[in-house]
C-alpha cells in the first residue's frame, strides 16, 4: 500500500488555476465516489487556498493516477496542471497533512479554520464510505497535531487570517467608522468577517444565496440581512464588500460593477475571498475601485511568517514528534497480518487437539470448559513474547518473515 497526496495551493498555483480545480461542497460526493476506482481509502480537502487529494492506493505509481484523476475531474489539461501540483508519498504525505493541520502551510500562518475544513473533508469521505482504518487514524492524528501546535506554541496568537488581512487593506483606503459594509456569503468566512467588521461599524448587511442562512447569521449579530435578489441595490449603497461564497458563478461581473460605480461616484473597496472568484478580476480597473483577491493578500501573510520564525520552529518540532508516533503505528499495521495469521494458526491447532482429546474423555461440561480455558491460556502465553517481538521490530520485519516461513502461515485463512 502507498499513501499519496496530490495537490496545489497558493504558493504553487495562481488563483486562475485554483479556481478551476476547486471542488464545491456539493461536488464532493460524486468526486469521492469516482475516487474509489483508484483508491482503497481517501478524502478530498478543498479550500479557498488549496485543493488536495489524499489516497491509500495499491498501485506503485499512485501519484500519476491521482494527477490524472484531478485533471479529468476538473476538465483541465494535465500538461497545464502539472507545473502547479505537488506529490508527496508515505512519510512525506503524512508530514504534509500534519503541517497543513497545524497552520504551517496556510497562507495565514497558524490560522485555525483549516481544522474545521479538514473535519468537513473527513465527514464527506465518511458519508461515501471511503474512510477505512488508515485514513481515519491519519485524520485524527492530523487534528491532534494541529491542536497540540496551537496549545504548545504561540503560533496562533495574534494570527493573521485572510479576513483580517482584508480588513487591514480596507483600512488603508477608508476610515471604516460607520461605513456601509456588505458581506456576501453566510458561511464560516462570512461570519468571521462579520465579527471583525463589527468592531468598526454596525452598518453591515449580510446576503446569501440561501436567505435563511443570512437571516440567522444577521439576527445573531444584530445586523441586517437581504435576499440575494436585492444585491445590486445593497451594493450601490456600500463602501466595503466582502464576498466569500462557494458559487461557481460570478456574484459581480464587470458590466454590473461599471454601472454601479458610475452611479456611486465614490471610493469602493472590494475584497474577494472566494475560490472560484466571486468578482470579475477586471473590476479593479474601474475608477476609485480597489479590488483584492486572496492572492493579493499573500505578501502580507509572508511577512507575518518571517516574523514568527521561533514559533514556526517549535511547531515543526511538534509535527516531527507526532510523525514518529504515526510511523510506529503504520509499521505495526504492516506486520498485523502476520500476527493475526500466527494466532489463527495456533487457535486452529488448539481447537483440533481439544476436540480430539475431549472425544476420548468422559468430562462434564464444566470440566470441558476448564480444559478449554487451560489450552487458551497456554496458547496466549506461548504467543505473547513472539508477537510482541514482531511488533517491536516492525521497522525491520525479518521476524515477521521468519514466522511466516516457520509456521507456513496461511493469510487467506484469517
UniProtKB/Swiss-Prot annotation:
Species assigned in the record: Herpetosiphon aurantiacus (strain ATCC 23779 / DSM 785 / 114-95)
Supply the name of the protein. Glutamyl-tRNA reductase
* Residues under site feature: Important for activity: 96
Instruction: Present the record's domain note.
Output: Possesses an unusual extended V-shaped dimeric structure with each monomer consisting of three distinct domains arranged along a curved 'spinal' alpha-helix. The N-terminal catalytic domain specifically recognizes the glutamate moiety of the substrate. The second domain is the NADPH-binding domain, and the third C-terminal domain is responsible for dimerization.
Similarity annotation: Belongs to the glutamyl-tRNA reductase family.
The catalytic activity of this protein is classed by the Enzyme Commission as: 1.2.1.70
**Task of the protein:** Catalyzes the NADPH-dependent reduction of glutamyl-tRNA(Glu) to glutamate 1-semialdehyde (GSA).
- Write out the GO biological process terms: protoporphyrinogen IX biosynthetic process from glutamate
Q: Other remarks?
A: During catalysis, the active site Cys acts as a nucleophile attacking the alpha-carbonyl group of tRNA-bound glutamate with the formation of a thioester intermediate between enzyme and glutamate, and the concomitant release of tRNA(Glu). The thioester intermediate is finally reduced by direct hydride transfer from NADPH, to form the product GSA.
List the keywords (alphabetical). NADP, Oxidoreductase, Porphyrin biosynthesis
Question: Could you say which residues bind substrate here?
Answer: 47-50, 106, 111-113, 117
Molecular function (GO) terms for this protein are:
glutamyl-tRNA reductase activity; NADP binding
Q: Pfam families annotated for this entry?
A: GlutR_dimer, GlutR_N, Shikimate_DH
InterPro entries attached to this UniProt entry: 4pyrrol_synth_GluRdtase, 4pyrrol_synth_GluRdtase_dimer, 4pyrrol_synth_GluRdtase_N, GluRdtase_CS, GluRdtase_dimer_dom_sf, GluRdtase_N_sf, NAD(P)-bd_dom_sf, Shikm_DH/Glu-tRNA_Rdtase
EC top class, as a word: oxidoreductase
Residues that, per the record, bind NADP(+): 185-190
Superkingdom, natural source: Bacteria
Oligomer and partners: Homodimer.
Q: Which CDD domains match?
A: NAD_bind_Glutamyl_tRNA_reduct
Q: Which SUPFAM superfamilies match?
A: Glutamyl tRNA-reductase catalytic, N-terminal domain, Glutamyl tRNA-reductase dimerization domain, NAD(P)-binding Rossmann-fold domains
